[in-house]
Amino acid sequence: MGSLEKARRTQTAVVGNNQGGVQLSHDAPIPEAKGDIVVVRAEAVSVNPVDAKMRGQYVTSGAIGGCDFAGVVVEVGLDAAKYDIKVGDRVCAAIMGMNPLEPAHGAFSEYVGAHAFALVKIPPTVSFESAAALCTCFMTCGLALFRSLQLPGHPLSPSSKPLPVLVYGGATATGTAAIQLLRLAGFTPVVTCSPHSYDLIKSYGAEAAFDYHDPDCAAQIRAQTKNGLRFALDCITNTQSMQICYAALGRAGGRYTALDPYPEAVAATRKIIKADWVIGPVMLGLDIGWPAPHGRKADPDLFEFGQRWKATVQQLLNQGLIREHPLFVQSGGLSRVIDSMEAILAKKVSGKKMVCKLSQ
């Protein structure tokens, strides 16, 4: 145990309700520190599109939502020490919020329960607000780029050949994370976004930018890559995005990875392309209790990959080699989380990562 008052076992949190949505609760349970579980006093949280999409059958009444948080460890279970986590550590993580199997664990709470193996330590030079915006993006991109797409390089062991890799939706938070990781790994990021985001994505390392609204977008990418593009990461994942990615990939085919289930009808148009989609929580090594197609049993191999990749993210962060997406930081605590979700659903958020400060 740590400094958290033992008598206090309830807290304010954003939880699922009986209508398939979320609400602010002031009597949510505080997680218990046991085994490898630690309790973190949250200082900042970020709101991702996946949080906003958690509606309907994905909602468990009373379960705490949210994936990304940053804060200070206040309690530790007995097994936390083997992951070098102790009370007082500044940490951030991507966890599985709105989890029917661990309903008391979610980022959108005053005190967050998390498995110690999921935690990334925050360097002294990185703020809580910045740290809260890092883990979901960089963890998921690592899975997509270096496991699913099987890129022949790594940020700590760069490719000797600067192969082009398409990032569709480069102005998203996952997009700018992917661009940075590709550059570090020795690849050439070729990116789609709206023209008003060209300067943004080039500041993160994009080699070339293409307007996905342009009917000739795919043809322009094929020309840029000399009809030899072999890898595409789709950060948007809808029919249009997949069609452009498929049309941009070269004559020899290649690999396409999405961040949501992709349209099978588009996949059928070019069987020479290997399509896949990923979700970050598989790297936690836990059963996922969400409905199909997201629910699944724990995969030990993906957990091992996740632990290796988390160590890479920690090293890149310690060395100052990665940075967060541009932030829109809000005061007002957890009440702003629901506002941020609604803004994302209404497509009022562009080029910014929504971060909510929990302390003044």
Swiss-Prot record:
It is an enzyme of class 1 (oxidoreductase). Pathway: Mycotoxin biosynthesis. InterPro entries: ADH-like_C, ADH-like_N, GroES-like_sf, NAD(P)-bd_dom_sf, PKS_ER, Trans-enoyl_RdTase-like. Keywords: NADP, Nucleotide-binding, Oxidoreductase. The keyword Flavoprotein does not apply. NADP(+) binds at residues 50-53, 171-174, 194-197, 212, 259-260, 349-350. Substrate binds at residues 136-143, 280-284. Its EC number is 1.-.-.-. GO terms for molecular function: nucleotide binding; oxidoreductase activity, acting on NAD(P)H. The keyword Membrane does not apply. Trans-enoyl reductase; part of the gene cluster that mediates the biosynthesis of pyrrolocin, a bright yellow trans-fused decalin-containing tetramic acid with antimicrobial activity. The PKS module of prlS together with the enoylreductase prlC catalyze the formation of the polyketide unit which is then conjugated to L-serine by the condensation domain of the prlS NRPS module. Diels-Alderase gNR600 is involved in endo-selective Diels-Alder cycloaddition to form the decalin ring. Subsequent methylation is carried leads to pyrrolocin A. Belongs to the zinc-containing alcohol dehydrogenase family. Monomer. This is Trans-enoyl reductase prlC. It comes from Fungal sp. (strain NRRL 50135). The lineage of its organism: Eukaryota, Fungi. The gene is prlC.
